[in-house]
């Protein structure tokens, strides 16, 4: 976060949870609510929304020595996007931009259906995020392998803020969505890239498709939910996991993907 900030890339105000005086200065300067986030972990695991200073200090004292593994961040209401990329010798050779239906933090705290859907590269938000993602990767000196980055578009001013990045493939079946819409299996390509590098060979990305797609995942009331009723021809993948429901829809028609995502999200909520 500090490296990205020093590169002039916009991001929410933050403070490491180490020095108590610095934390107090942050809480006096940045109005609540805040977000207390693990510096490790994946997705929205372990993230706490903090309403006021009393609640913050309760969490910090409760964490004890583990508090230093957290970062305190300004809460920015907005729409959250993710950028999944593959970088070779410092050059981003593959990038895919998607937008979450609801921010993962909201889904993990309040429940509901987790959804995300791809954006075409011609979309203005995608264009802005491809550029911003490249700036983040360059600032961090990442030269080799996959990245999964998240950004938020502020409701207040419509500007993008960098949230976080990890040098790994995205979780929560995001890699399955990327594979279904582009033909690029990020896990397999990461392995191929490592093998080519170890052998001193040149890595070549496979042909990339540019389809539209959406992913839906949620907890299920049934032990093994019946997914056969979700039978649109655009459904290309279904989750087979106890107490879970999930699927991916893919089409050349962006509006068809959005209509199916909305319809199936409503049905997931009822079923």
What is each of the regions a protein language model found here?
Residues 41-45:
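Conserved A3 ("GATE") glycine/threonine-rich loop of ANL adenylate-forming enzymes
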Residues 17, 47-52, 86-88, 120, ...:
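Short beta-strand-to-turn element immediately C-terminal to the catalytic PLP-Schiff-base lysine
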Residues 1-28, 255-257, 262-263:
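Conserved N-proximal alpha/beta basic substrate-recognition cap immediately N-terminal to
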């Amino acid at each position: 976060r500090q490296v990205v900030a020093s590169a002039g890339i916009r991001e929410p105000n933050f403070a490491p949870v180490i020095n108590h005086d610095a934390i107090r200065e942050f809480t006096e300067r940045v109005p609540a609510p805040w977000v207390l986030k693990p510096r490790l972990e994946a997705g929205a695991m372990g993230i706490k929304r903090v309403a006021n200073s009393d609640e913050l200090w309760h969490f910090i004292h409760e964490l004890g020595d583990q508090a230093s593994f957290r970062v305190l961040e300004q809460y920015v209401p907005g729409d959250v996007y993710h950028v999944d990329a593959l970088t070779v010798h410092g050059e981003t050779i593959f990038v895919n931009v998607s937008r979450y239906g609801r921010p993962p933090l909201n889904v993990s705290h309040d429940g509901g259906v987790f959804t995300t859907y791809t954006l075409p590269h011609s979309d203005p938000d995608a264009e802005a995020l491809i550029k911003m993602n490249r700036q983040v990767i360059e600032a961090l000196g990442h030269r080799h392998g996959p990245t999964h980055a998240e950004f938020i578009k502020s409701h207040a001013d419509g500007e993008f803020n960098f949230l976080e990045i990890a040098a790994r493939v995205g979780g929560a079946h995001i890699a399955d969505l990327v594979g279904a819409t582009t033909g690029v299996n990020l896990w397999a390509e990461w392995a191929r890239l490592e093998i080519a590098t170890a052998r001193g060979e040149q890595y070549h990305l496979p042909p990339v498709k540019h389809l539209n797609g959406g992913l839906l995942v949620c907890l299920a009331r049934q032990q093994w939910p019946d997914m056969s009723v979700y039978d649109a021809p655009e459904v290309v993948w279904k989750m087979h996991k106890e107490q879970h429901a999930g699927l991916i829809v893919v089409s050349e028609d962006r509006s068809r993907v959005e209509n199916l995502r909305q319809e199936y999200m409503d049905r997931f909520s009822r079923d």
